[in-house]
Amino acid sequence: MYPKKELAQTIIAACRIFEIQTVVISPGSRNAPLTIGFSNHEDFETLSIVDERCAAFFALGIAQQKQKPVALVCTSGSALLNYYPAIAEAYYSQIPLVIISADRPSHLIDIGDGQTIRQENIFQNHILYSANLKENDSDNNSLKLSKAFSLLHNVKGPIHINAPFDEPLYETVKKMSDFSFKIEKPDTETNIDYNDLAQLWNSAAKKMILVGVHYPNAALEILLDKVADDPSVLVLTETTSNLNNKRFINSIDNLIFNLTKEEFTSLQPDILLTFGGLIVSKKIKKFLRDYSPLEHWHINELRAFDTYQVLSKHIKTDSYSFFKNFHKLVDYKNKSNYESKWTHYKKQTRAKHNHYIKTAPYSDLKVFDLVLKVIPDFSEVQFSNSAIIRYSQLFEMNSTLTVFCNRGTSGIDGSTSTAIGAAYATQKPMTLVTGDLSFFYDSNALWNNYIPTDVRIIIINNSGGGIFKIIPGPKKSSALEYFETPHCLTAEHLCSMFGFEYSTAYNLNSLEEEVVNFYKKSDKPKILEIFTPSDQNDLVLKAYINNLK
């Protein structure tokens, strides 16, 4: 049984031809032709999630894991607007999503008809392509769909298909019509002068490679390790870089918290080479803006952000292809102490870090130390934003873990939904480490029939936005409560309502007891809520930073 609407059939056929496999549908009437078509087609896996904002982040999590486009289908009106936070995240994180919105016909727009807004080009600032379709315009619709889907073969990100349907909406046929689409293959040729780049590279005494959000890539790790044989090369990674090597520096912030001007000057790179997604560390961004490199090269097929205001080269290829060609041209006999200087600071800082953490009082910082140690090997970890991802940056991660965080727009709004979508799509056990505000903000993420039983959610509940006691400004103002938004909420009743096992910890002893059972197999997903002292967390962190001097 398929929709009688030709426009719905065209969209469904395009999704099949362009190998969309998963479709996340939110309920509504205007999208009935699409819902009927997708749910009855054997080539699609269809999932139903009521809350459109959660649905979009859930789809984002699936696409993040599969690295393939996932489609979203919703009704007309404000339902579509609820997709926007996830669309913005997908745009800046370059994650492929196909947004399919049902719409009213054009003659019903702006005349006071119900559930009707101006949907055409609604995401124009954060979308790769908007295909505004029309009923009874098959040829043009096919051309627009071909262009939209072909774009996903060239670059990654969200596309929007807006489909107006007039009533009746529920008529069906037994067979779909045939449609043709033109697949435009990506242009894989790149004009990169590796010899010219190598000449500049080899003449520089201080080269820094800074890696942002990245998928695990063992072959790339090997190439980076070879490039790092050059003593004038330093590789900095973050928690979300997923590239692990003892030679790489992965706890950037605690390394540069307390450096002097003279030390910063000596570490100022001649060439900065960046790849991957957005950088978490504000400290390294400030350092590279205050002590600008002579050259900044960025590797990315689509775009290059001028994060440090000195961008000189956009190298349009993927990171593996670049280093596969480039490492052969590197001069490894460069006489430089650049890497050894940073390594010296790293050893000093790591010793001070370990010494302080051993005796640190119960706090967010101490909790992080224990939590990161008990996450099982070869798990996937999703961190929420704000203080959570920043705390994670202070610790060396278990190299067997795969780490993700929504750093495209760095919002707290969809971390739980993204993690659950990712858990649904991966074979690995999933742990989400989240703050209380991020968790409660996205609590509808638990209203979901697709949560694997091996999902583990760790909530670090410091009774509000603890980061606002850490960053300069809010604490000195007379409006701290509006920044921190203190509360006395717990996740206990949410767990009961949505079928999660629930446990709590209030101090180090109870936490050590709870984590023993937390990762044991269960027929339900689990939540561990850890309560920390909101009046002490910022003081402990500041003492930690001072200890690194």
Regions found by a protein language model. Name each.
Residues M1-P3, D290-A387, Y506-K549:
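Phosphate/pyrophosphate-binding active-site segments
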Residues N82, V211-W297, N398-T426, F440-N444, ...:
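Glycine-rich, anion-gripping cofactor-binding loops and their flanking helix/strand elements
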